[in-house]
Regions:
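Outer-membrane beta-barrel domain signature, especially the mid-to-C-terminal portions
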Residues: 127, 176, 182-184
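Outer-membrane beta-barrel transmembrane strands
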Residues: 6-45, 49-53, 69-88, 108-110, ...
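Residue-level detector of the transmembrane beta-barrel scaffold of outer-membrane proteins
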Residues: 37-39, 94-98, 160-162, 184, ...
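Short, basic alpha-helical nucleic acid-contact segments in DNA-binding proteins
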Residues: 106, 188-189
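Surface-exposed loop/turn segments flanking beta-strands in extracellular/periplasmic regions
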Residues: 1-8, 52-67, 107-135
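A cross-taxa feature marking solvent-exposed loop/turn segments within ectodomains of secreted
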Residues: 90-92
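Solvent-exposed loop/turn segments connecting transmembrane beta-strands
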Residues: 171-177
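Glycine-rich, aromatic-flanked loop segments that form ligand/cofactor-binding clefts
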Residues: 100-107
C-alpha cells in the first residue's frame, strides 16, 4: 500500500476557494380595501465559486502533479404574487382565503479544467500542463411555475373547514406529464 508524505499532504495538497454571493429581495404589500390585500415579492440569489485543486509532484496518485480549476456559477430567482381575502359575516361565519402564484428559475453552470501532470513542479497554471487540458462542463436549468390557493371557513370559531390546492409545472419533467396537483381538505371542531 502506498502511503503519502503527511507533510506534503497537509501543507501542499491544498484546495483554495474563492466565493462571491449576492442575495437581493424586493417586496410590496398593498391593502386594496377592508377585505382584500395584495402582495408581490421577488428574491434573487447568485453565487460564483472559483475552486482550485493543487497536487504536487510525487503525491500519491499524482506522480507528475495535478492542477484543477472549477468555476461554478449558479443563481435562483423566486417570485410570488398573492391575493388574500378576509371577512367576518354577521351569521358567525369567517372566511380567510388566498390565491397566488410562484415562479422559480434555477441555473447552474460548472466548468472544470484539469492539468494531469505539470511541466514545472509547483507552478499551478493550466499553461503548465504536460499534455492537453482535460475539461468538463455541466449545465443545469430548472424552472417551476406554480399556482396555489387556500381557504379557511369558520363557523362561530367552533367548526372549521380548510381547503388547499397547489399545481406545479416543472421543466425537469416530460412535457406531457410535467404538471402535478396536490389538494387537501380538512374539517375540525
Amino acid at each position: 500500500k502506498n502511503i503519502g508524505n503527511p507533510f506534503l499532504t497537509l501543507y501542499e495538497c491544498v484546495n483554495p476557494t474563492e466565493k462571491h454571493s449576492n442575495i437581493s429581495m424586493l417586496s410590496a404589500n398593498l391593502k386594496l380595501n377592508n377585505h382584500f390585500d395584495f402582495m408581490i415579492r421577488s428574491a434573487f440569489q447568485m453565487e460564483n465559486d472559483i475552486r482550485e485543486q493543487h497536487r504536487p509532484v510525487s503525491t500519491v496518485g499524482f506522480a507528475k502533479g495535478y492542477f484543477k480549476t472549477q468555476n461554478i456559477f449558479n443563481y435562483e430567482l423566486n417570485s410570488d404574487v398573492l391575493l388574500t381575502y378576509h371577512n367576518s359575516f354577521s351569521n358567525g361565519l369567517t372566511l380567510n382565503a388566498a390565491a397566488g402564484g410562484n415562479m422559480m428559475v434555477y441555473k447552474v453552470n460548472m466548468l472544470s479544467n484539469a492539468a494531469n501532470g505539470l511541466i514545472t513542479p509547483g507552478v499551478y497554471k493550466l499553461a503548465n500542463a504536460i499534455s492537453s487540458i482535460e475539461w468538463d462542463q455541466k449545465i443545469l436549468n430548472k424552472r417551476v411555475n406554480s399556482i396555489y390557493f387556500t381557504a379557511n371557513l369558520a363557523y362561530k370559531n367552533k367548526l372549521f373547514l380548510d381547503i388547499t390546492g397547489r399545481n406545479d409545472w416543472s421543466s425537469t419533467l416530460p412535457k406531457k406529464n410535467n404538471s402535478f396537483f396536490y389538494p387537501s381538505v380538512s374539517v375540525s371542531t
